[in-house]
Amino acid sequence: MERVDELELLMEKSFWQEAEPSAELFQKKKVEASFSKIVLSRGMDNRYLVLAVDIVQSEEGNHEKHLIITASQSLEYKELCILRNDWCSVPVEPGDIIHLEGDCISNTWIIDEDFGYLILYPDMLISGTSIASSIRCMRRAVLSETFRSSDPATRQMLIGTVLHEVFQKAVSDSFAPEKLQELASQTIQEIRHLKEMYRLKLNQDEIKQEVEEYLPSFSKWAGDFMHKHTSTDFPQMQLSLPSDGSNSNSTCNIEVTNSLDIEESIWSPRFGLKGKIDVTVGVKIHRGCKTKYKIMPLELKTGKESNSIEHRSQLVLYTLLSQERRADPEAGLLLYLKTGQMYPVPAKHLDKRELLRLRNQMAFSLFHRINKSTGEKTELAPLPQIIEEQQTCKYCSQMGNCALYSRAVEQQMEDSSVPTSMWPKIKEETQHLKPIHLEYFSLWCLMLTLESQSKDNKRNYQHIWLMPASEMEESGSCIGSLIRIEHVKTVCDGQYLHNFQRKNGAIPITNLMAGDRIILSGEERTLFALSRGYVKEINSTTVTCSLDRNLSGLPESTLFRLDQEEKNCDIDTPLGNLSKLMENTRASQKLRDLIIDFREPQFISYLSSVLPHEAKDTVACILKGLNKPQRQAMKKVLLSKDYTLIVGMPGTGKTTTICTLVRILYACGFSVLLTSYTHSAVDNILLKLAKFKIGFLRLGQIQKVHPDIQKFTEEEICRSKSIKSLALLEELYNSQLIVATTCMGINHPIFSRKTFDFCIVDEASQISQPVCLGPLFFSRRFVLVGDHQQLPPLVLNREARALGMSESLFKRLEQNKNAVVQLTVQYRMNSKIMSLSNKLTYEGKLECGSDKVANAVINLPNFKDVKLELEFYADYSENPWLIAAFEPNNPVCFLNTHKVPAPEQVEKGGVSNIMEAKLVVFLTSVFIKAGCKPSDIGIIAPYRQQLKVISDLLAQSSVGMVEVNTVDRYQGRDKSIVVVSFVRSNEDGTLGELLKDWRRLNVAITRAKHKLILLGCVPSLSRYPPLRKLLNHLNSEKLIIDLPSGEHESLFHLLGDFQRK
């Protein structure tokens, strides 16, 4: 699913949810934003709600923080948690969720420096790497979590990744020198590493040579720590484990016996941590005549042998993660691959305590990214304090964002404080930016953060551990009780094909479909998030998934669950684009000038100066097939120096126009980056383009690409041509003038070295500004294609919407009229249907492409026979509403249900109208009996509950497969007949949000080619301004027909009689 109607669901919820008593607000103020229900529990996985926080003074005169907490859903049974020593500094507040480790005696927990831990927001899982990096600078760690794409790839990172993989393969195979050479060669030839070499402009042979320098150390390490004859042959080390007791000798010999797992992914909702352990190894600790066996994390480092606090801290955190799967390892092993030197790292209580306190500080900063006080405006919260370590800042990858956030956000606050020594650096990093640029950054940063924190938009996965699969299955986003069948097939390194079946019975009804991203977990609590991947194939008995880990090592009896990986609001990419827009580069400066400063776009005067002589005949031939507005669009784009906006009104052949534009640009020798928000929109253009034998490169995950386009994907080309060298990959990237991807695919390495002559963005009016920005950095000129009179960008958060987040870049730039070309000749609607949109939205600009289009009516070959039946059952010729609805020569009618009556029903599930639903089914069944194909009929309703009611009634009737969907799903598509059920009908004047949106109404009334039937209660719908305007027009044209008054049961009887016939 690419673009779903979450906005509609959100608006529906806002209508039928009751207001909560203010007394309960404090309990839910943050919890509700994280999860729809407060899930509390005792025991090992306890989750407590904090009800009150007090600072008290102990008898010894020390300050303590006393928390009144409860694990009771009814909030009746309360307990006390006493925080002592440094735990007092944990920024815990009423309404927070916490997890406690320790002992509870007489309903009292005591957490102090010697015993116990408190985990704040345990459902927020933070990586061990992030926490370790926060030791030197908490601000950098928080920025890296926020602006993820700003941490650039480096040569050393690539070499580190390759070395990790070689070591990990060797530990499961052999450390023989010739084997290591073979593994290194194979690993360097893998496409993902070649792509990084391309990004970083590296030489493949040089990288191979540098990797090979490490290999002797690999063999040395294996010789030292594996496969010796006696325990004394292993190196001596100093390691004391708590379980050995305080009197134990710390000297021991360490033997690594075997590798149990590679890149073991562990999520720990107990400690609020997540991470991937490089290698999980079995270790024998020989101490005198005693031997102890432990399973430990082995962390690999490729940089300088520092045994630094960050490196050691990572291992300490991995010991906590390991406890989710097995006994406490009490220590970990730190191996520097350059030298083969290995250090044991004990996990002492003090270290774990301080690291978990750091984790809590970081969680607090990430959770409280918004400051919102009652009656005050919402604003971004300040980040952790800027440190005064210029050497650390000098090499910090987040320095630009640090300074930018300080200038744009924090320095606008009254209590802003920046260390004096850092002022010159902040000024240097941001001096190229005007105040208006900083305001743009601050506003969009706020709106994106608000959107990401919407209840229906949180990118949290706590349902995996908080809700059983059986419950989640009801939502359609999960399948539980799965067992693995057949052998795991290795597609390539990092892709493993797994087949699953339900342990008992068939696969339940689900929303999961091929191409959907998923997270695979075990049903038991120790096996959260074992692997990530996507659904390859799904049917009633089997689910086939491509996963990033081979799970064949788990017992055959293991029960699994699949959870859909929702990415409704992936703000990493738009925040990265926003940050990039503020950079001091030529491309960013140009976009700031055009987008923020509204510099007038420039145009060339004569086509002859841009049209190559050899391309003139080809271009002229292509132009012959276009109408006048389309030809004007081609000319405007060719003459542009900056950008062009093409307004694609309904039915005007937007996709054909884009395809033609690409053909012309290709003929002129221009390079083109073709993008859109959805994969389907990109592929719709490519499907047309492929017919003209024009080559292109399609980027993106192959499972998301249309089957007929997959042969043009990078993945398929690399596979079919067996590309294993950087030279061949470069040749592929340089061979195609046209590259296509979605707006979210702009982190691909090709964009690090390629600038296109033109970037074309389809669906531009539906894409939020920071997302749309992404591809524009990589082109000299851009073309936005859309129509802001149709669906806007999807924004779930009301506050973000009110601040202006639904303004697309297309809408923002449309004020420069000289850059706008309108496509006004449409080939979809007949003249009567078109007139509605002309009156409502387009001020008479739309025109039919031909008389044939203007006069087209629905073809119903069996209509005469059906008319006779209707005459018999319903006195057809005496019923104006039946004539209006079914006569082919009446293309438009509004059936007013006010007198029927047809009241709405408001339930927890949403808003529906059973009478309208039955009318829709009746109308549909008549049209099908009259000879219309089910696939030529579209049913639209604004509320999901109504869609469900209509779908259920259709399933019970003899009607075939008719598409029932929301307006959002019909954007860009059409049907011969469209029936719209408006649902709302009440006496109390209640208004919902959905029908207030004139753009949705415009889309709804422009989907039909030959017949448009609107159903609703005129008095109720007249309260909505957009509908009032439409109804006034329909009334003036005498197109509103009142359904007969009287007992509505008799009408139901009539409909039933006809359907049974």
Swiss-Prot record:
Record-level GO cellular component terms: cytoplasm; mitochondrion; nucleus
InterPro entries cross-referenced by the UniProt entry: Dna2/JHS1_DEXXQ-box (IPR026851), DNA2/NAM7-like (IPR045055), DNA2/NAM7-like_C (IPR041679), DNA2/NAM7_AAA_11 (IPR041677), DNA2_Rift (IPR048459), DNA_replication_fac_Dna2_N (IPR014808), P-loop_NTPase (IPR027417), PDDEXK-like_dom_sf (IPR011604)
Record region (Nuclease activity): 82-519
Domain of life: Eukaryota
Keyword Transcription (UniProt): no
Enzyme class: hydrolase
Catalyzed chemical reaction(s): ATP + H2O = ADP + phosphate + H(+)
Cofactor: record remark: Binds 1 [4Fe-4S] cluster.
Binding site for ATP: G648, M649, P650, G651, T652, G653, K654, T655
Subcellular location: Nucleus; Mitochondrion
Post-translational modification summary for this protein: Acetylated by EP300, leading to stimulate the 5'-3' endonuclease, the 5'-3' helicase and DNA-dependent ATPase activities, possibly by increasing DNA substrate affinity.
GO biological process, one term: DNA replication
GO MF annotations, alphabetized: 4 iron, 4 sulfur cluster binding; 5'-3' DNA helicase activity; 5'-flap endonuclease activity; ATP binding; ATP hydrolysis activity; DNA binding; metal ion binding; nuclease activity
CC cofactor: [4Fe-4S] cluster
Gene3D superfamilies: 3.90.320.10, P-loop containing nucleotide triphosphate hydrolases
Keyword annotations: 4Fe-4S, Acetylation, ATP-binding, DNA damage, DNA repair, DNA replication, DNA-binding, Endonuclease, Helicase, Hydrolase, Iron, Iron-sulfur, Metal-binding, Mitochondrion, Multifunctional enzyme, Nuclease, Nucleotide-binding, Nucleus
Binding site for [4Fe-4S] cluster: C137, C393, C396, C402
Record-listed E.C. numbers: 3.1.-.-, 3.6.4.12
SUPFAM superfamilies: P-loop containing nucleoside triphosphate hydrolases
Region ranges (Helicase activity): 520-1061
UniProt record similarity statement: Belongs to the DNA2/NAM7 helicase family.
Subunit structure as annotated in this protein's UniProt entry: Interacts with BLM and WDHD1.
Protein name, entry field: DNA replication ATP-dependent helicase/nuclease DNA2
Annotated source species: Bos taurus (Bovine)
